[in-house]
Amino acid sequence: MANESEIQKTENAEVANAANGTNPNNERRGRGGRGRGGRGRDGRGRRDDRRNEEAGEELIEKLVHINRVSKTVKGGKRFGFAALVVVGDGKGRVGFGHGKAREVPEAISKATAAAKKTMIRVPLREGRTLHHDGRGRFGAGLVYLRSAPSGTGIIAGGPMRAIFESLGVADVVTKSVGTSNPYNMIRATFEALNDQKSPKAVAQRRGKRIADLFGRGGASAAKAEAEAAAVVE
């Protein structure tokens, strides 16, 4: 009888906990596992945002592509979303990131955070175009980049336009062949941008003056040196 009484008390306590929406065991797992982990991940994101605000850094964020994905598990399929985001400061720095999550906003947030961590600096001529032509390849994708005179605008489409707008380029001519996959186009474009070198960097690597690279003399040489000094690496 004593055992039956104890069992009955235990069952009554469990029913009361369920009615009140409390469960000591589940509550401990929430604090020690998912709860604390969730706060940690969200907390890091919020701290990163605060650091950007404190530094006065304003970033341009562009959603390039989003698609639905699925993962086959033992119980069936789990559906989610994948986002591709490009981030830049409009002053020569740009990055891209990819994120997956069950919900669209969370996928975009993950992609944005990843893009901020992979930003690269691209030297720009006069702060508006590339220093020289370039080419990049990734997978089946091949992209061509050409510097352009003032007033040309951004001749690019889709993912490539988002990159140059975020980068701060005002005049450029591009062409993409071989693929329409936005991921391949983005990676091929970044490969081409990574190969961009300013006259200042080339002169330092070769141990020459800027004017020597262009074969200039007199006032033209002084102008070339001044233009090179104004380039932000």
Curated annotation (Swiss-Prot):
Sorted alphabetically, the keyword list is: Ribonucleoprotein, Ribosomal protein, RNA-binding, rRNA-binding
Q: Which GO terms describe its molecular function?
A: rRNA binding; structural constituent of ribosome
- Could you mention a single GO BP entry for this protein? translation
Q: Does the keyword Lyase apply?
A: no
Q: Which residues form a coiled coil?
A: none
Q: What range does the record give for the signal peptide?
A: none
- Which PROSITE patterns does this UniProt record tie to the protein? RIBOSOMAL_S5, S5_DSRBD
The GO cellular component terms are: small ribosomal subunit
Does Cell membrane count among this protein's keywords? no
**Which family does the similarity line name?**
Belongs to the universal ribosomal protein uS5 family.
PANTHER family cross-referenced by the UniProt entry: MITOCHONDRIAL RIBOSOMAL PROTEIN S5
Purpose:
With S4 and S12 plays an important role in translational accuracy. Located at the back of the 30S subunit body where it stabilizes the conformation of the head with respect to the body.
Q: What is this protein called?
A: Small ribosomal subunit protein uS5
